[in-house]
């Protein structure tokens, strides 16, 4: 390795105390959740409080740690300053609608109209997932928040929500000037919240989203860790993801290459040898393409990485580069 090349570890993330938001993403099946859990464990050793959030509908955090997590943050057994939560996007919007409908009366008609408007917005379930995150984060004070994201395409949509929601809420606020009095007479007369209260809440949400949007584009506060395996499709997805992140002005300078094979000397396994050669070809391409990135190389594990102890052991590979010793 060139002496001028960035260190092949995620120690740079651990050392960057200013980081507030860390996204971990990649193609499905590359070890994204294992990496995000392991990074969270390492950060918990250096930060006062860490929150790990799953925005992947599959929700593998519970399986990884071997304990049940839900929409409210809960501490990881044995690591008191690390909390996890799993967000159900569809549940978030359904809960909002049910709460609004419970008011009944004439306001229910307005609720149905708002429901129709809400569901006509592309990606609204994921947007509500983002709103759920904001609500949770605003009521707490975690030092750093890590997102175990959905597979690649969903991840990038999630990162654009601050901009999308900011524009949408801006338009809704404009409508308040034109229809505010009418909504006030419809809603206020039913003993529910007034239109002014509703629009004030929308404006408050927009301000929060705008603030977070600015933070996402600040490399001192936000970074994205790409996880891949040394195969063509994964490399292709990673390149597309890096380009998209760059176009969104979101910092990314760390890539984790997972599931690397290291056949033993004298091993006559033809399949192992063939896969090793293929992996080395794509690993070289990754090293050439991203020479200014921190590229972490992780070996294929002989057993599933599940439970706190196994994750702690695996997490050391993120900060202490793996050294293969031939027998």
Curated annotation (Swiss-Prot):
GO terms for cellular component: GET complex; Golgi apparatus. One of its GO terms (biological process) is tail-anchored membrane protein insertion into ER membrane. Its main location: cytoplasm. The keyword Cell wall biogenesis/degradation does not apply. SUPFAM superfamilies: P-loop containing nucleoside triphosphate hydrolases. It comes from the Eukaryota. Keywords: ATP-binding, Cytoplasm, Endoplasmic reticulum, Golgi apparatus, Hydrolase, Metal-binding, Nucleotide-binding, Transport, Zinc. ATP binds at residues 27-34, 231, 258. Its EC number is 3.6.-.-. The active site is at residue 56. It is found in: Cytoplasm; Endoplasmic reticulum; Golgi apparatus. It is an enzyme of class 3 (hydrolase). Zn(2+) binds at residues 269, 272. One of its GO terms (molecular function) is metal ion binding. ATPase required for the post-translational delivery of tail-anchored (TA) proteins to the endoplasmic reticulum. Recognizes and selectively binds the transmembrane domain of TA proteins in the cytosol. This complex then targets to the endoplasmic reticulum by membrane-bound receptors GET1 and GET2, where the tail-anchored protein is released for insertion. This process is regulated by ATP binding and hydrolysis. ATP binding drives the homodimer towards the closed dimer state, facilitating recognition of newly synthesized TA membrane proteins. ATP hydrolysis is required for insertion. Homodimer. Component of the Golgi to ER traffic (GET) complex, which is composed of GET1, GET2 and GET3. Within the complex, GET1 and GET2 form a heterotetramer which is stabilized by phosphatidylinositol binding and which binds to the GET3 homodimer. Interacts with the chloride channel protein GEF1. HAMAP family: Asna1_Get3. Belongs to the arsA ATPase family. This is ATPase GET3. It comes from Yarrowia lipolytica (strain CLIB 122 / E 150).
